Amino acid sequence: MRILVQRVTEASVNVDGRQVAAIGPGIMALVGFGQEDGPDFHNRPAFRGMAQKLAGLRIFPGQGELANKFHTSLEEFGGQLLLVPQFTLYADCRKGRRPSFTDAGNPAWAEPMFEHFVKIVDESCSVSVSSGIFGADMAVRLCNWGPVTIWLDSLSLFGS
């Protein structure tokens, strides 16, 4: 599982010209599942570990002396979270100029996995959680804050 975390002042997702999700200050995260995750990934500790890591990242400013430091989590800051499914996080560009996506998870199990991840994150933190639509051609807009962009990989963090 891979997550590209971006701290934003605002973000939104449109599908077919209609807004399906929007947030104010918080995190917009692109979420992808790989073949190495497999259809049972939601049963492994790394699945919940990634949800906890995302919700607990201290990438927001504190108060006073800590105003310019990464001090508070999304929940402490009172921000919002937008999760966007993104299979292209598993692009393989080693050969030629056209990326291969054979390392991306099979949509048959990756779609319910994404929906379950949204549910787990929503249940585990008190912030507003919104999401894009799996498999849709989405227009994603965001305004980076910082910018702050962080890469989370379940293999690197949890060994699975």
From Swiss-Prot:
Q: Where in the cell is it found?
A: Cytoplasm
Q: What is its main location?
A: cytoplasm
Q: Which reaction does it catalyse?
A: glycyl-tRNA(Ala) + H2O = tRNA(Ala) + glycine + H(+); a D-aminoacyl-tRNA + H2O = a tRNA + a D-alpha-amino acid + H(+)
**Superkingdom of the organism of origin:** Bacteria
Q: Which Pfam families match?
A: Tyr_Deacylase
Q: Biological process GO terms, please?
A: D-amino acid catabolic process
Q: Does Hydrolase count among this protein's keywords?
A: yes
Motif Gly-cisPro motif, important for rejection of L-amino acids, which positions?
146-147
Please provide the record's keywords in A-Z order. Cytoplasm, Hydrolase, RNA-binding, tRNA-binding
Cellular component terms (Gene Ontology):
cytoplasm
Instruction: Please describe what this protein does.
Output: An aminoacyl-tRNA editing enzyme that deacylates mischarged D-aminoacyl-tRNAs. Also deacylates mischarged glycyl-tRNA(Ala), protecting cells against glycine mischarging by AlaRS. Acts via tRNA-based rather than protein-based catalysis; rejects L-amino acids rather than detecting D-amino acids in the active site. By recycling D-aminoacyl-tRNA to D-amino acids and free tRNA molecules, this enzyme counteracts the toxicity associated with the formation of D-aminoacyl-tRNA entities in vivo and helps enforce protein L-homochirality.
Subunit details: Homodimer.
Question: What's the family?
Answer: Belongs to the DTD family.
**What protein name is recorded for this chain?**
D-aminoacyl-tRNA deacylase
Q: Could you tell me which species this protein originates from?
A: Desulfovibrio desulfuricans (strain ATCC 27774 / DSM 6949 / MB)
The gene for this chain is dtd
